[in-house]
Curated annotation (Swiss-Prot):
PANTHER family: NH 3 /GLUTAMINE-DEPENDENT NAD + SYNTHETASE, NH(3)-DEPENDENT NAD(+) SYNTHETASE. GO terms for biological process: NAD biosynthetic process. The gene is nadE. Homodimer. The lineage of its organism: Bacteria, Bacillati, Bacillota, Bacilli, Bacillales. Deamido-NAD(+) binds at residues 139, 172, 179, 259-260. This is NH(3)-dependent NAD(+) synthetase. Pathway: Cofactor biosynthesis; NAD(+) biosynthesis; NAD(+) from deamido-NAD(+) (ammonia route): step 1/1.
C-alpha cells in the first residue's frame, strides 16, 4: 500500500461524498456523543473562516434537533475570540448571522496574551518570538472555550479536518484542543460542498483561509505558510495525481507532525519509534 493511500485511510478520507448525507451523519454524531457524555451542549470559537462556520452550523443544527427531541437544555454557544481588532470582523459577523447560534459571546484575548508575553519577558529576560506568541494566542482561545464549557456544561468543538490533520497545520493544545471533532475526514473542498448545501454565503468559503496568528504577517494565508495549496492537499488525500514536489512536501509534514495526532508519548507507546 502506498503511503498516500495509507494516510488517506488513517484520516478517514473518502474520494467523493454526498454533502447532504455527510451533514446528516455529522449532526447525528454530535447528538449521539452529547447524549453519551451527559453534557448540555456545545461551544465553539467563530472566526469567520470556512471551518468554524461549518462546524458551528452543524453544532447549532444538532442543538436545535436535540431540543425538538426533548432535550430542552441543549444549547450551542458561539464565542468570538478576537485579538484586539480583527481585520475581517465583517466575515465573523456574517458567519454568526448564518449559523444563528443560541447564544453569542465575545472574549477579547489580547489583554491576556499581552500580560503573558510581558511576564514571560520579565521572568526570562527575552521576548517571545512572533511564532510562539501566535501559539499563545491559539492556546488562549482554547482556554477561553474550555472556561465557557466548564461553567456551562458544554463540549468544546474542534474544527480539525483531514487537510489540516495531514499537514499538522494546527496548534498543539490550541485549536487542536477539543472534545469533539465533527469535520474529521473531510478535505477542504469537501467542507466547501457542505457549506454550499447548507446555503452559506459564498464569501465564507471562497475566501483564502488564514490562521492569522502572526503579528508580523497579518492575514497571511495558510497556503503561503504551508508552501502548498489546499487543492494539492485535497487531491493527495482523495487519491488523485499530484506533483512529486507536493507529495514530498505533504508527506514530510505528515511525518513531522505525527506527535500532534497522538496523545503525549510514553515508554509504552510505539508510534514514535
Amino acid at each position: 500500500m502506498s503511503l498516500q493511500k495509507k494516510i488517506s485511510q488513517e484520516l478517514h478520507v473518502q474520494p467523493s461524498i454526498d454533502p447532504k448525507q455527510e451533514i446528516e451523519k455529522r449532526v447525528g454524531f454530535l447528538k449521539d456523543y452529547l447524549k453519551k457524555t451527559g453534557a448540555k451542549g456545545f461551544v465553539l470559537g467563530i472566526s469567520g473562516g470556512q471551518d468554524s462556520t461549518l462546524a458551528g452550523r452543524l453544532a447549532q443544527l444538532a442543538a436545535s434537533e436535540l431540543r425538538q427531541e426533548g432535550k430542552e437544555d441543549a444549547v450551542f454557544i458561539a464565542v468570538r475570540l478576537p485579538h484586539g481588532v480583527q481585520q475581517d470582523e465583517g466575515d465573523a459577523q456574517l458567519a454568526l448571522s448564518f449559523i444563528q447560534p443560541d447564544k453569542s459571546w465575545k472574549y477579547d484575548i489580547a489583554p491576556a496574551v499581552t500580560a503573558f508575553s510581558e511576564q514571560y519577558q520579565k521572568d526570562t529576560g527575552g521576548p517571545l518570538s512572533d511564532f510562539n506568541k501566535g501559539n499563545v494566542k491559539a492556546r488562549m482561545r482554547m482556554i477561553a472555550q474550555y472556561a465557557v464549557g466548564g461553567e456551562e456544561g458544554l463540549l468544546v468543538i474542534g474544527t480539525d479536518h483531514a487537510a489540516e490533520a495531514v499537514t499538522g497545520f494546527f496548534t498543539k493544545y490550541g485549536d487542536g484542543g477539543a472534545d469533539v471533532l465533527p469535520l474529521t475526514g473531510l478535505t477542504k473542498r469537501q467542507g466547501r460542498t457542505l457549506l454550499e448545501a447548507l446555503q452559506a454565503p459564498e464569501r465564507l468559503y471562497l475566501k483564502k483561509p488564514t490562521a492569522d496568528l502572526l503579528d508580523d504577517k497579518p492575514q497571511q494565508t495558510d497556503e503561503t505558510e504551508l508552501g502548498i495549496t489546499y487543492n494539492e492537499i485535497d487531491d493527495y488525500l482523495e487519491g488523485k495525481p499530484v506533483s512529486e514536489q507536493a507529495v514530498e512536501a505533504i508527506e514530510k509534514r505528515y511525518v513531522q507532525s505525527e506527535h500532534k495526532r497522538q496523545v503525549p508519548a510514553s515508554m509504552f507507546d510505539d508510534w514514535w519509534k
